[in-house]
Amino acid sequence: MARAAALLPSRSPPTPLLWPLLLLLLLETGAQDVRVQVLPEVRGQLGGTVELPCHLLPPVPGLYISLVTWQRPDAPANHQNVAAFHPKMGPSFPSPKPGSERLSFVSAKQSTGQDTEAELQDATLALHGLTVEDEGNYTCEFATFPKGSVRGMTWLRVIAKPKNQAEAQKVTFSQDPTTVALCISKEGRPPARISWLSSLDWEAKETQVSGTLAGTVTVTSRFTLVPSGRADGVTVTCKVEHESFEEPALIPVTLSVRYPPEVSISGYDDNWYLGRTDATLSCDVRSNPEPTGYDWSTTSGTFPTSAVAQGSQLVIHAVDSLFNTTFVCTVTNAVGMGRAEQVIFVRETPNTAGAGATGGIIGGIIAAIIATAVAATGILICRQQRKEQTLQGAEEDEDLEGPPSYKPPTPKAKLEAQEMPSQLFTLGASEHSPLKTPYFDAGASCTEQEMPRYHELPTLEERSGPLHPGATSLGSPIPVPPGPPAVEDVSLDLEDEEGEEEEEYLDKINPIYDALSYSSPSDSYQGKGFVMSRAMYV
């Protein structure tokens, strides 16, 4: 009993020592309900205006805000208090930097202090004319009753958007690395990042100096390579990245390298022969700046009289033995000189090997085209045959898997034939009679035997004898009594429709039934009996 009593919960009130602890817990819980909402980082442009948001959330009825202050904990002691706002005394800016000229409360608007309860919930502070010294941590603090003091901290960053430019440097051909382009990002904070985009063999050299504005940096990147004619006219791209840019700045630069002429000679086709009149040599030049002079000469010192120099071209009026030499084209510009040589071999007769080679090349191309067309045609034919075989196999599978295309005669047709034999064989109503002539068994009575719907054609013996159609020499002909008069039109119509359906069904099974059927009886057979030989049953 004592143990059970010990397990029962105690119903005694809390001891007096627990009341202060419970009160502290309630106060701490209530204080956590109110918080200060600030941004962890705010960026402002150098020389511009920035707002530092600060809100007391959530609005609590009966909460009294006694004071709002902004402080800079990392500033010197005499500059830590930046701004304050009292419900009755209004705003105050004790620190000379930034001072009242550059600070203001956005919501309170430095009002007279009347009706400021709602305004104090929003303690957003605005800074005008940002300088580099304004960068740092700012603390927004609310002194409230009965919740106590709550605060939030914001980091203010002062950035400066740089000004970018890129330009090419006019350089002259040399064997040493030289700066051929510059990319400059001026007065940025923080310093900009510069890179180059190019397929040339290059390297970049970067320097940083202080900008004209305090706290800014100017970055210069030099695009360096060994200047040559290959680099002249090539476009490279300067890429500048900065946190104030939404996307990197891309600045194209076209390089300009001055170099002496690079010369080559064209026009010789290895088919110069004595007496040829349509020969020409051309001096092809690539240079910067443009060529200023062309000079044609030979290594032998003898210049053919039938060759005439016309600037960059050498026109030959008639080829003779003097052209068996080496021609030299010399080109000059403001940077230097370049030359090229071309050896000429003069033949006695035209060279047909080149024409044959050209014809062989053309023939080979045509043969390749024809072979490709034949191969493509063969592939298409094979694919078509394979497709047709696949479709045919699929159709055969469907035919094998599906139900049979015919069905045996229904018992209903036989029963109807047995019930109305006289109606089927009435010669007087030929328009309603069936297409097939029935036959009878001689050994059975007319009422017991089943009426057949088709019979075989007469044999040769039957055709040669004087028997009636359907009779044979194996037995005596059996007379068929004439049928009763025609029934009513309604019965004949029904019988006609059912007969046509059965006729179509049997024709689908085997078309030979149509060939074996007799035509409709004529008027000459009316009133006569019909006989059938029993030989077909043997």
Curated annotation (Swiss-Prot):
CDD domains noted in UniProt: Ig3_Nectin-5_like (cd20930), IgC1_2_Nectin-2_Necl-5_like (cd07703), IgV_1_Nectin-2_NecL-5_like_CD112_CD155 (cd20989)
Cytoplasmic side: 382-538
InterPro entries: CD80_C2-set, Ig-like_dom, Ig-like_dom_sf, Ig-like_fold, Ig_sub, Ig_V-set, Nectin/PVR
Domain of life per record: Eukaryota
Signal peptide: 1-31
Any one GO BP annotation for this protein: cilium organization
Positions where Phosphothreonine occurs in the chain: T410
Entry's Gene Ontology cellular component terms: apical junction complex; cell surface; cell-cell contact zone; cell-cell junction; extracellular exosome; focal adhesion; membrane; plasma membrane
Protein name, per record: Nectin-2
Lineage: Eukaryota, Metazoa, Chordata, Craniata, Vertebrata
